[in-house]
């Protein structure tokens, strides 16, 4: 045991000490012999020393308790080997020391002794708040006796056995029940409120997890309810024909209202448009509406309402609708078209020609465009943007973007008189006789889910243009501009198709740089002990330690950084100003260090002349630091030669005078 009077030793014992906070993962918690010394009688500072073992003479470290700010007892630690241990900490201005006792009685003894020496009082606010959280987390298992007043010291916990919660609650420790503690919580505050609040929070988590695990029907029902509350046109997911709004039904649910005039698409042609989408167009109630068997798509559920008139989409018995080998329909795309308000009944469009009857052209190009007239109707087909390979299987179609559609007029419509090409400068979505195309262009926001196109019932010649930026492989052999196919993007999966926004951090062999930052934050939270409902904190009333240190009229000890044992070398590093000041610093002040380093710098400055100590250079080099040694490397040759000659002459004179002195003696 260390020297010193035995009267000042307050407490001794074995404790496990934590490494520094930044090294909790790399270094182990070491067992050390701690001695608590009180210096009130001798005038020395109050210190907590720890040694390598009981018989060590020199302490590994001396913790000055005058710098102690707070003491917390009953901390919770997630580390496996220390999960059920009794952890308390000592917070100083330099570092926070986490100490682990073997029993709860030992922890209470150390905490009580340290608090008595430092003059700490228990923090009332933190204790009450933590106990309220404890009652909320444990629910009916908590008793009213746990809401005790905070002036009880930690020694009252000796009578209660340590109990730890095995339930997956927020905290690991369960507050012990002390029968002699008096509850301070008023009877007017019902305890069931806290328990119900916890139940509500857990129910929210269950609902959140269920929203990710269930199918899209529940999600689409939520979207239908939102739409029904905002517009009042859709009720319980069934599309109703109210004031010209046609709503798409939910998946696997048929609309019996339009059963005779329903045009069912195959599964590969079904649009992803959910019940949240509504169609606007003419005011008549006898128009045919083609309902879709829509697949469930969880990624495009958050798109905005698509305002179109009706869903005139041709079908085919094939697995995918192919317009003469140029476009392939995606099963998850919305269909958009523009309707004439004056039309009363529209016959279903004829089936498209088979691929063998069509012309072959490049992938992603447009074959022909219908004429733009008042009596003509452009039939819209949902065509995904395909800029890569022409060989598309069903799995590729399912993975394709369901937030990006084209409006393409189908061929063979009964109302189309002829096929003609439009001018490249103005290519309409449906039909347009507008004179200026600049006024009709609407800027497109790829991340928005707003309404893209809406046909006014009273205007037959006005439509909306939406510019589109084509991909690198979008070819147009007939000279049509790329804006002929307006595109709308959703916020969910548009980035999978466009090649420019490539996230190169997703490559398998690429090391992501932000990963260590996240791990560092997680390790700090997981590795550090945290407060639990049974944690009690002690600190000074004014939370200042300078007044307490001046109260005892003792200087701050410089031994708090003193360490000579190699066992804790990782925490005893003292940064040096100069590499030549490696000599041990005596206890007291650091003033002798610059003097020694200055003398060493003089010899380093004259290192190019090792055998000649020049006394007249000392005043000039006394203020030179080690960082300015490079000035002596780049010297003038003439001055150097003159200096060497002078030194040689001085050496010769000294050698010639020595024999004469010897002769005189």
Swiss-Prot record:
Q: Where is the signal peptide?
A: none
Q: Can you say where in the cell this protein is located?
A: Cytoplasm; Cell membrane; Membrane raft
| Phosphotyrosine, modified sites | 263, 290, 441, 632
What is the tissue localization of expression for this protein?
Answer: Ubiquitously expressed.
Motif SH3-binding boundaries: 348-355, 499-508
GO CC terms for this protein?
Answer: cytoplasm; cytosol; membrane raft; plasma membrane
- GO process terms (BP): cell migration; integrin-mediated signaling pathway; osteoclast differentiation; phosphatidylinositol 3-kinase/protein kinase B signal transduction; positive regulation of cell population proliferation; positive regulation of epithelial cell migration; positive regulation of mast cell degranulation
The record's statement on gene disruption is: Mice are viable and healthy for up to 15 months. However, they have reduced number of mast cells and develop osteopetrosis.
UniProt family annotation: Belongs to the GAB family.
On assembly, the entry states: Part of a complex composed of EEIG1, TNFRSF11A/RANK, PLCG2, GAB2, TEC and BTK; complex formation increases in the presence of TNFSF11/RANKL. Interacts with HCK. Interacts with SHC1; may mediate interaction with receptors. Interacts with SYK. Interacts with PI-3 kinase. Interacts with GRB2 (via SH3 2 domain). Interacts (phosphorylated) with PTPN11. Interacts with TNFRSF11A (via cytoplasmic domain). Interacts (phosphorylated) with 14-3-3 family proteins SFN, YWHAB, YWHAE, YWHAG, YWHAH, YWHAQ and YWHAZ; prevents interaction with GRB2 and attenuates GAB2 signaling.
* Function per UniProt: Adapter protein which acts downstream of several membrane receptors including cytokine, antigen, hormone, cell matrix and growth factor receptors to regulate multiple signaling pathways. Regulates osteoclast differentiation mediating the TNFRSF11A/RANK signaling. In allergic response, it plays a role in mast cells activation and degranulation through PI-3-kinase regulation. Also involved in the regulation of cell proliferation and hematopoiesis.
Question: How is this protein named in the record?
Answer: GRB2-associated-binding protein 2
Q: Which organism is it from?
A: Mus musculus
């Amino acid at each position: 045991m260390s020297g010193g009077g035995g009267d000042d030793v307050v407490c001794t014992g074995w404790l496990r000490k934590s490494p520094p906070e930044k090294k909790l993962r790399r270094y182990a918690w070491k067992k050390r012999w701690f001695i608590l010394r009180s210096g009130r009688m001798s005038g020395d500072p109050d210190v907590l020393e720890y040694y390598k073992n009981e018989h060590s003479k020199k302490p590994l470290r001396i913790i000055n308790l005058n710098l102690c700010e707070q003491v917390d007892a009953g901390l919770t630690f997630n580390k496996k080997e220390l999960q059920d241990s009794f952890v308390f900490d000592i917070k100083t201005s330099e570092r926070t020391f986490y100490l682990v006792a073997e029993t709860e009685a030992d922890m209470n003894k150390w905490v009580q002794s340290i608090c008595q020496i430092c003059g700490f009082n228990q923090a009332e606010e933190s204790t009450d708040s933590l106990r309220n959280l404890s009652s909320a987390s444990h629910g009916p298992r908590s008793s009213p006796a746990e809401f005790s007043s905070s002036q009880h010291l930690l020694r009252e916990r000796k009578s209660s056995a340590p109990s730890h919660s095995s339930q997956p609650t927020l905290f690991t420790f369960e507050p012990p029940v002390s029968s002699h503690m008096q509850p301070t919580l008023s009877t007017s505050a019902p305890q069931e409120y806290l328990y119900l609040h916890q139940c509500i929070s857990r129910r929210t988590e269950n609902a959140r997890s269920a929203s990710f695990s269930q199918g899209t029907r529940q999600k689409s029902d939520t979207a239908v309810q939102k739409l029904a509350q905002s517009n009042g046109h859709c009720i319980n997911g069934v599309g109703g024909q109210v004031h010209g709004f046609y709503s798409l039904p939910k998946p696997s649910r048929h609309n019996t209202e339009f059963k005779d005039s329903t045009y069912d698409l195959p599964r590969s042609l079904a649009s992803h448009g959910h019940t949240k989408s509504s169609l606007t167009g003419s005011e008549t109630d006898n128009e045919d509406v083609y309902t879709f068997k829509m697949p469930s798509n969880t990624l495009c559920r958050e798109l905005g309402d698509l305002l179109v008139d009706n869903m005139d989409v041709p079908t085919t018995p094939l697995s995918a609708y192919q317009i003469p080998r140029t476009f392939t329909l995606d099963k998850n795309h919305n269909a958009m078209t523009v309707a004439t308000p004056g039309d009363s009944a529209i016959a279903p469009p004829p089936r498209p020609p088979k691929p063998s009857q069509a012309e072959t052209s490049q992938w992603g190009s447009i074959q022909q465009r219908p004429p733009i007239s008042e009596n003509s109707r452009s039939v819209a087909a949902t065509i995904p943007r395909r800029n890569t390979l022409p060989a598309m299987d069903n799995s590729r179609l399912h993975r394709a973007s369901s937030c990006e559609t084209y409006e393409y007029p189908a061929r063979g419509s009964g109302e189309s008189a002829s096929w003609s090409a439009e001018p490249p400068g103005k290519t309409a979505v449906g039909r347009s006789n507008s004179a200026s195309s600049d006024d009709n262009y609407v800027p497109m926001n790829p991340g928005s889910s707003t309404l893209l196109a809406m046909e006014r019932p009273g205007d037959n010649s006005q439509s909306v243009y939406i510019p589109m930026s084509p991909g690198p492989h979008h070819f147009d052999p007939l000279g049509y501009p790329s804006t002929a196919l307006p595109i709308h993007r959703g916020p969910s999966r548009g980035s999978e198709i466009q090649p420019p926004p490539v996230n190169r951090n997703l490559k398998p062999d690429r090391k992501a740089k932000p990963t260590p930052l996240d791990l560092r934050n997680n390790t700090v939270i997981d590795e550090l002990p945290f407060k639990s409902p049974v944690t009690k904190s002690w600190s000074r009333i004014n939370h200042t330690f300078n007044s307490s240190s001046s109260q005892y009229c003792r200087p701050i000890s410089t031994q708090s950084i003193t360490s000579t044992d190699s066992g804790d070398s990782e925490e005893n590093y003292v940064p040096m100003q100069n590499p030549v000041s490696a000599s041990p610093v005596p206890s007291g002040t650091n003033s002798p260090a610059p003097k020694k380093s200055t003398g060493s710098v003089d010899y380093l400055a004259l290192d190019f002349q090792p055998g000649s100590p020049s006394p007249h250079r000392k005043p000039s080099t006394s203020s030179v630091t080690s960082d300015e040694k490079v000035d002596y490397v780049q010297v003038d040759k003439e001055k150097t030669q003159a200096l060497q000659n002078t030194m040689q002459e001085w050496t010769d004179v000294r050698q010639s005078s020595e024999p004469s002195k010897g002769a005189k003696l």
